[in-house]
Amino acid sequence: MTLNLADLRQRYLKDGLDENNTDDNPFVQFEKWFHQAQKSELLEPNAMVLSTVNEVNQPSTRTVLLKQFSDDGFVFFTNYRSQKAKDIQHNPKVALHFNWLELERQVKIQGVAAKISLKDSMRYFATRPKGSQIGAWVSHQSEVISSKQLLLSQFEKMKQKFQSGEIPFPDFWGGYMVVPQQIEFWQGGDNRLHDRICYTLKDNQWVKQRLAP
């Protein structure tokens, strides 16, 4: 079967991105765009694609949720026994990608991932809904399971076990911070003349440049 998508295209007609109107600090620029994405009521504006590479140089992507960001980096949480965690242990160089289609915007981040402190992971875990806390215990992420029903059954057992009192913190779960080395802001443009403003960290200083689309 062949599916021809040659005529499937979209014009980008929103305002362009002028480097003179972008902040010299990429984190400030990201915060500005992120708040605009929130105000636009996009579905999970904090959803980002995380790209990793395994021990045989096979790349993988998956969507995770940004839970914190600051001038230090971008934080997400996961099971430390998952495939993504194994990939990061092998090669901590990763990429993040935010795709805000309704705003005709993308943000691409290249950096290095490292585990955050146990204290910070525990603090965030305590804020999660009880069902999500139980889910962290039940799901042996990336492992083969016989059925969805088995997972639901295990969830109910854990729910009964922890029906009273706090749910303990799983030591195989926690956060990663991606410390960026390059951050690119992309704004769609008419006739495919897109705007690309790229910040690269050089000698502990952010260098801002315009890239050809």
From Swiss-Prot:
It is an enzyme of class 1 (oxidoreductase). Keywords: Flavoprotein, FMN, Oxidoreductase, Pyridoxine biosynthesis. Substrate binds at R9, Q10, R11, Y12, K67, Y124, R128, S132, R192, L193, H194. One of its GO terms (molecular function) is pyridoxamine phosphate oxidase activity. It comes from the Bacteria. InterPro entries: Pyridox_Oxase, Pyridox_Oxase_CS, Pyridox_Oxase_N, Pyridoxamine_oxidase_dimer_C, Split_barrel_FMN-bd. Pathway: Cofactor metabolism; pyridoxal 5'-phosphate salvage; pyridoxal 5'-phosphate from pyridoxamine 5'-phosphate: step 1/1; Cofactor metabolism; pyridoxal 5'-phosphate salvage; pyridoxal 5'-phosphate from pyridoxine 5'-phosphate: step 1/1. Its EC number is 1.4.3.5. The keyword Oxidoreductase applies. The keyword Oxidoreductase applies. PROSITE patterns: PYRIDOX_OXIDASE. Catalyzes the oxidation of either pyridoxine 5'-phosphate (PNP) or pyridoxamine 5'-phosphate (PMP) into pyridoxal 5'-phosphate (PLP). Homodimer. PANTHER family: PYRIDOXINE-5'-PHOSPHATE OXIDASE, PYRIDOXINE-5-PHOSPHATE OXIDASE. This is Pyridoxine/pyridoxamine 5'-phosphate oxidase 2.
